[in-house]
Amino acid sequence: ERLKTLGKSDKMQLTKKEKKTLLEYKSSASYRINELLRNHKDTDELPEQERKFVEELDSALSKMPQYEGNLIRTVDFTAFSDKNERIEKFMKEYVENETVTINQYWSMSKERGYNEDADIQIYVQSSKKGRDISSIGLDEKEVLYERKQEFCVVKTVNYNGKYFILLKER
């Protein structure tokens, strides 16, 4: 029995449509979908095509393994002329000892090394709920949180003009 399950990877449990949806999300759809999710509290408000995409992605993510370990996400507003205002607005959402709910899908990395000069670096300590999607598509060390994930803001620090946020899953 053990040999039967040994060779099965997590991505083999996905339907073709779910795998296609995950690949599409990882390429370019993430920006469009996450923007819609940020601006609409209820998926029923989304256009039908996007609503179906979200349903398919939710289904795919539910089949992916949960990642256990520490994660990092970087946020960089350097390309914007109103960089400082954007940073200030972003940081107002992260108040120590408060809960923050992420309405969109949230991509994190298992490893440091991606844009370490970013304005904001977000760390999740001892993750258990993020979905490990690194086996899908390019060899990225990506973990994706499902919609409406809640985090407790453990600590925020401004060090040499860079912000560091430590979160713990709720």
Residue ranges and their predicted role:
Residues 1-170:
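Mono-ADP-ribosyltransferase
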